[in-house]
């Protein structure tokens, strides 16, 4: 068509607007819907909400326009230096004679760009608390298992086979695309759909599964709308995306992460044969414990019966003794009363005469007074004896009495006592005191 236009219109005269419109028509009709990969530069958003930027590769530049409704659908912030893949239609802008790409869809391209977007999204969602929710425990024996995955491929077959092999359970499959532009929205809608089912049809646990792949292949499972759907789910979710080394954001929001889809099936149900063996073991233990408990209580009942018979005999014996004692009391009591009455008669009125009681107490007081007087005299004599003995001892220790026995006191010229040869060595004058006087002695 373009070649025909050049041949047919070679000699025709056009106005500027006519040729501009014709070029626009040719671009739109010949290229249609295309995909282009490049790096964003000169990104800016006008007051109208539309975005304008260039897509460049080395020295080549392509102007791009992203209208406000399309920009609102893009799930990550755009900025210079980001490598992207853009889907849209080529057109021209007559205002400055240039062609441009009208953006219809935009996806990140290149590992660096995708990791940058992933880290920024993870940090933002983590601050919101979407990865710190209270985990819902996986039920031990689910009545129904919901599986969200592609209806084709090995993943769904592996999950069904593993569940049937371990513990056959009713499976509800919600088929979705696990890769592509709208995949994240489909998976999020499936989670919300399971949660909206009536209780009679609602699954006990949901498995979100996909096989392994590159970061681009698994990108749908990093979708923000999917993370929020997993966070808000009232049904516990097991995420099984990729292989053990693959991590996506849904893994952080799910209630349990399985390294593979097969492992997710193993987390969902126990092994029936092992469960049966365990129950049989518990049954044996329970029966054995029950028998032991019955034997124990039967033995206790037998012991209680023996104790009851012993206590009954003991009580009967004591009752018999009590009866005999009662009979004896009935026989003895009249005689005892008669004896006490006789004793009472022998008690003369004079024995309780107040005058006699006073005389008796006076005599008793006299005896006590005499005893106290004698005791006081003895104590006083004892103190006098000790006092005399101590006085004699003190007198014997008086130095005057010692001098009378032939001893003397020797003092120096200054009146200091000289008690040994050493203390007297430097003295020239001595004062010697005897019992009858004192003399002064001078050393030659």
Curated annotation (Swiss-Prot):
It comes from Rickettsia canadensis (strain McKiel). GO terms for biological process: DNA catabolic process. GO terms for cellular component: cytoplasm; exodeoxyribonuclease VII complex. It catalyses: Exonucleolytic cleavage in either 5'- to 3'- or 3'- to 5'-direction to yield nucleoside 5'-phosphates. PANTHER family: EXODEOXYRIBONUCLEASE 7 LARGE SUBUNIT. The keyword Ligase does not apply. InterPro entries: Exonuc_VII_L, Exonuc_VII_lsu_C, OB-fold_nuc-bd_dom. It is an enzyme of class 3 (hydrolase). Its main location: cytoplasm. Coiled coil: none annotated. The gene is xseA. Heterooligomer composed of large and small subunits. This is Exodeoxyribonuclease 7 large subunit. Pfam families: Exonuc_VII_L (PF02601), tRNA_anti_2 (PF13742).
């Amino acid at each position: 068509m373009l070649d025909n236009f050049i041949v047919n219109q070679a000699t025709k005269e056009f106005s500027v607007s006519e040729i501009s419109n014709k070029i626009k028509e040719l671009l739109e009709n010949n290229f249609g819907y295309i995909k282009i990969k490049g790096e964003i530069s000169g990104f800016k958003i006008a007051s109208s909400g539309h975005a304008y930027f260039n897509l460049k590769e080395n020295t080549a530049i392509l102007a791009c326009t992203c209208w406000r409704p399309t920009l609102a659908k893009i799930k990550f912030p755009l900025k210079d230096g980001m490598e992207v893949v853009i889907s849209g239609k080529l057109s021209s802008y007559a205002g400055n004679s240039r062609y441009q790409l009208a953006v219809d869809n935009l996806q990140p391209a290149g590992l660096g760009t995708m990791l940058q977007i992933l880290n920024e999204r993870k940090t933002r969602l983590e601050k919101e608390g979407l990865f710190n929710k209270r985990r819902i425990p996986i039920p031990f024996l689910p009545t129904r298992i919901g599986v969200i995955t592609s209806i084709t491929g090995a993943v769904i077959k592996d999950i069904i086979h593993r569940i049937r092999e371990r513990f056959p359970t009713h499976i509800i499959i919600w088929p979705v695309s696990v890769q592509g532009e709208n995949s994240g929205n489909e998976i999020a809608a499936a989670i919300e759909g399971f949660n909206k089912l009536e209780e009679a049809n609602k699954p006990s646990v949901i498995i979100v599964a996909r096989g392994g792949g590159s970061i681009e292949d698994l990108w749908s499972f990093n979708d923000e709308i999917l993370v929020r759907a997993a966070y808000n789910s009232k049904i516990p979710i097991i995420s099984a995306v990729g292989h053990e080394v693959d991590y996506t954001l849904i893994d952080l929001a799910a209630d349990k992460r399985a390294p593979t889809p097969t492992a997710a099936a193993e987390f969902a149900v126990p092994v029936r044969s092992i469960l049966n063996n365990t129950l049989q073991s518990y049954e044996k233990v329970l029966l054995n414990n029950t028998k032991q408990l019955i034997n124990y209580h039967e033995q206790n009942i037998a012991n209680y019966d023996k104790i009851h018979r012993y206590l009954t005999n003991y009580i009967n014996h004591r009752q018999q003794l009590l009866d005999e004692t009662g009979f004896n009391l009935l026989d003895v009591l009249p005689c005892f009363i008669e004896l006490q009455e006789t004793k009472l008669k022998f008690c003369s009125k004079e024995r309780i005469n107040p005058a006699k009681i006073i005389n008796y107490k006076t005599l008793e007081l006299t005896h006590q007074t005499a005893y106290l007087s004698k005791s006081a005299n003895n104590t006083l004599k004892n103190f006098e004896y000790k006092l005399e003995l101590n006085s004699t001892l003190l007198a014997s220790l008086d130095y005057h009495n010692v001098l009378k026995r032939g001893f003397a006191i020797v003092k120096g010229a200054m009146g200091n006592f000289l008690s040994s040869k050493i203390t007297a060595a430097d003295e020239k004058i001595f004062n010697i005191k005897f019992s009858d006087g004192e003399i002064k002695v001078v050393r030659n």
